[in-house]
Amino acid sequence: MTAMAAVFGILVALWLGAMIPGPSFVLVARNSIGLSRRDGLATALGMGAGGIVFGAVALGGLYTLLQTVEWLYVALKVAGGAYLLFMASKIWRGAAHPIAVADPLAARVGSTRKSFWMGLTTQLSNPKTAIWYASIFAALLPQHPPLWSYVVLPPLVFFVECGWYTIVALCFSTRRPREWYLRAKKWVDRAAAGAISALGLRLILTAPKTGI
């Protein structure tokens, strides 16, 4: 796998991870419905900023560690694949469960600055997000990535995270898209679970190989 393909794979995997309904998703949805569209967009910016932090840590820390402990590279691929399969099974089981969001009739004016920090702190305090980033970067990034990847990945990660949650904010601040997603949630979640399972199996099956 070339470095360019690895970067693209990381971005796709992070996009799929961002789409998984979790604390970040619910927070953006609640702020968009219960406060305002501006608060939802500010929360999305906070999620993107948190993605930059996770991306930078994954790039620097994992690369340095894998340089000195090569067997850990294989172990992380197996662990990452197992975690992705675990996450996929949870998503599949919870696909039929509705997402609890705030009552849109209880809307009030919020602070965009506060919403931004809520998004940032929620992103950074979620251990599942940290594990997700570590798994994806360790599994897909080459052991000796080119210098340009350190420059382009953080801003691209920001656009992936912020871009997805901006879509969430825009959708949940309007009635029809919100109702459509809530009706289709079961099938959307199961499609995401299938894609994540395929990625997890690939990581485990290719773990004995050196490089990606």
Protein language model regions, located:
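Juxtamembrane transmembrane-helix termini in multi-pass membrane transport proteins
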Residues: 2-74, 135-157, 166, 170, ...
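Juxtamembrane cytosolic amphipathic helices that cap and anchor the N-termini
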Residues: 5, 110-115, 124-127
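Hydrophobic residues within alpha-helical transmembrane segments
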Residues: 12, 16, 41, 45-49, ...
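Transmembrane helix irregularities
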Residues: 19-20, 124-125, 163
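Membrane helix-loop-helix hairpins that form the core translocation module of multi-pass transporters
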Residues: 38-115, 201
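Selective transmembrane alpha-helices of multi-pass membrane proteins
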Residues: 67-99, 160-168, 179-212
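Kinked, hydrophobic transmembrane alpha-helices enriched for aromatic residues
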Residues: 125-138, 168, 199-202, 206
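Short, flexible, glycine-rich and Lys/Arg-enriched loop motifs at helix boundaries
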Residues: 173-178
